[in-house]
Regions:
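Acidic interhelical loop/turn segments
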Residues: 95-97
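Short, solvent-exposed interaction modules
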Residues: 107
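N-terminal alpha-helical interaction modules that lie
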Residues: 1-56, 61-93, 102, 111, ...
Length: 147
């Protein structure tokens, strides 16, 4: 009897790549993003409601919210949805989730928004934990975020 399983000889941490969201989700978010005025945020919220597992939608809401508590809430939803997605993709609580993989960016944006909004509402311990987690997931992200 032979074992045809691949052998991972890497001594480094594993890297997780989230699957790309369905194209219709991205298109829906893109349409919502083209709205102008107060209708834009409403359209983005509606898109998140139609596709609650779309991490980019939660990240966008967190980044655009005009209230720190709202930003925190949107970021936290995206963060927890992202943890669920990471686990489904094989992540076991450690290893890299790199910014260079576009499909990972929604989760990383949510985590960055959570870090920022936690600091804004005085949750400095959570802000520090999020900063450390971001560094552990992708030590080079600071230089790449936003690109």
């Amino acid at each position: 009897m032979t074992d045809d399983s691949p052998v991972n000889l890497s001594a480094g941490l594993p890297e997780t790549l989230l699957p790309a969201p369905p194209e219709e989700w991205a298109e829906d978010l893109a349409r919502a993003s083209t709205q102008s005025g107060p209708g834009r945020f409403h359209a983005l919220r509606a898109a998140a409601g139609r596709h609650p597992r779309h991490l980019e939608a939660w990240a966008t809401l967190a980044e655009l919210a005009d209230d720190d508590v709202d930003s925190y809430a949107y970021a936290r939803v995206g963060y927890h949805r992202g943890l669920d997605a990471l686990r489904a993709a094989g992540w076991r609580g450690s290893g890299y989730v790199r910014w260079r993989h576009e499909a990972n960016r929604g989760f990383l944006r949510c985590l960055e928004a959570l870090r920022r909004s936690a600091g804004a509402i005085g949750e400095s311990d959570e802000e520090e934990r999020c900063a450390l987690f971001l560094y552990q997931l992708d030590p080079g992200m600071g230089a790449n975020a936003g690109s």
